[in-house]
Amino acid sequence: MMLASSAPTAPSLLPPSSQPSAATTRADDCSSSTSPTNTSASDASMEMLTSLMNGAVAAAAAPGNALVKQESPPLTTPPLFNPDLALLQFSQLFQAQQAMVQFHNQQKQQQQIIQQQQQQQQQQQQNQNPSQSQSSSSDRKRSYPCTFQYCVICQKDVHSSKLPCHIRQCHVAKPMFQCPACDFTSTYSKNNVKSHMVSLHGLAGDPISYMDKYAGQVEEFMKLCFPNVRGRGRPMQGRSSPKSPTSPTQPGRRGSQASSLPSRRNTVSQNDLLATLQQHQQQQAAFHPLRNLRFNPLQSIFPAVLANNNNNSVLATNKHVNNFLIKQEESEVPPITMPMQDLKTMLDANSSPSPISLSSSIIPIQPIKPGENAQPKYMKSLDWTILNDLQMKGTVFADCRSNMELYAENIARKIENTKAFQSFVLSDDMRTVVEEVRSRVSIQLFEVMFAIHRMDIKVLNQNLVDSLLQIAPTNSDAQLLRKMENLSDPNEEFLLGLTKIDHIEEKLETMKHMYRFPEQVELLKENIIKYEIAVKVLSESRALRNVMQLVLAILNIGFFDDRQCLSINGFSVSDISSILSTNTPSGQSVQSILVTILKDEINLDLDELFGLIDVLEKIENDDVNSVAQDLMVLDDKTVRAEKEMEHSGSNIPLSEFVENAKTISKERWEHFKSLKTSIERLTIYLGSPLPRHQNLDAHSPFNNVLQMLRSLKTAIELDDASDDHHINVSSP
């Protein structure tokens, strides 16, 4: 104890007033290290605290050292080594480290929670089922509310997932997939054709696809059949338009729009964002029908609401509904193209006229010749033909309305100086016709207008349609009628009412075609059957074959004395007239020898032979080429009816007529192709095979045989008359 108390105090290098307080310095260091983000300061404080503690332990152990012999004064503890202050500094440092660890753990937990929420949402959207959608229906509106859609043309419900298949199978009705090894096709199922390829041919791979060929037609039928559906079977409600900028860029499964949206951390939740987008899309879809809405003064007469089998009223937003009045604001009629394959003429020896294809080509045709319509009926000074809007497309006059703006004013000033313009004049003859039509109409004018607009043949009979077509004002006549200020004549008022019907001539022509199509098709069928009977009779007639062989024998024996008929193998029946008039070396004509043989040969049935004359006379004045031309005319009228149906909107009776007309026309074309093949075989049978570069004269074989039979019959009758006269003269 004496040694410890007498130990000398360590000398100080600084004066007492200038030495800094160790407690103050250490306190400042500790206070600087309490920040949870200053990690370097906390590390330095730990090192300083460790060194100070080691020094304190060494100082406390010094008095107990028995080897120290030097005496020193009593040891006084500096303020730095105050136990309370050291414990305070250590606790502050420990709290700073714990705060840093807790902060980093919270960050990691938040990231994990966000990732788990995203994964759960994606998994729920991918694995959702009808039961889950029903349970969540109270919380949010279903994204796919319509399970079935109503087909306007078929008038039945179709499942929403089967809309394109329904279009391809029921309306387009064209082979979409074909087996590459055979003619097996399917209108909608690719798997059926693949199964056929594997099971019957052992082929792997995909079948031949025609989907792209009929894609445009499928889209057009989609608009007609399901006017309240957008895209590939997607209802308008709760769905974004395919062209909307908010639509996902990648096609995904149903209800996967949320998964395609980028996640935004610490900004807006995904549910809020999806709800906002969905609300915006619903508002846009609800506002869309009101964009092009036009006032219709006849809404009380013609309702603007359509009902379907789902007991849902659908607003008739289709532009074709209740639009039979002409829209004066439309300056141009949209271009109408009638896609169909080019029909080859009957003179082509290699191929037959192909049946009409209304949607397999993009080549526009002109089924209306210039002057057939749009020709003014009430302007006698115009004796030249006028083109309609369809015929004007692609001509030198196509851009006249835009290019003549610079010259129109100058031309108008020069013409206005004369003050002489064409006016509407109702001649006496036309006035009589209009009065007769008005007297035959038993309904009011607006009912006539609506019947023409709907092309309703149940309201207007065929004679009335023909009469209305005769007096219907064209576009030029309508311009003059509208300029008239005072219309006191009821006939002029009746004509002015007809001018308000859009495409009135085309609609009346369509109704006329609907009336006359069955009769014309039946007439064509009868003509084809008459030719088929003539071909069959000539091909199977035993008497005709014997006569041709007798002529061949006469030529061989009469000219070459060849009783085995080896010199001349045969001849063309087309030359039979010149052959019969040829004289043999004996001075006898071939016809005289043949007539003598026919009279003496009892095995030949002359009644059967000359009975062919009655069959051939039935087609003597007909022409096979006219059958093909009549079929083409009917097809053109069907094209006009189909285009008018597309322009006027959905019309179920007209749609059924067009489909039926296409089917019947296809059958008649097949019938005609079969007839042409039979005529070609008959031509070969009669010894007139044609090379590929020579055209077939389908009427020649029948005329040649008919002339030969008439000549033989006349010669036999004359010979019989001369024999009777000789018998009468020689008898007593």
Swiss-Prot record:
Keywords: Signal
Observed phenotype of the null mutant: Double RNAi-mediated knockdown with sem-2 results in no sex myoblast production.
Known tissue expression: Transiently expressed in all mesoderm derived progenitor body wall muscle cells before they differentiate.
Pfam families hit by this protein: FH2
Region (Disordered) residue spans: 1-45, 121-141, 232-267
Position of the signal peptide: 1-27
Gene3D superfamilies: Classic Zinc Finger, Formin, FH2 domain
Biased composition, class Low complexity, residue ranges: 1-12, 19-45, 121-137, 240-251
Function field: Acts redundantly with hlh-1 to promote body wall muscle cell and coelomocyte specification in postembryonic mesoderm progenitors, probably through suppression of sem-2.
Protein name, as recorded: Formin-homology and zinc finger domains protein 1
Taxonomic source organism: Caenorhabditis elegans
Gene designation per UniProt: fozi-1
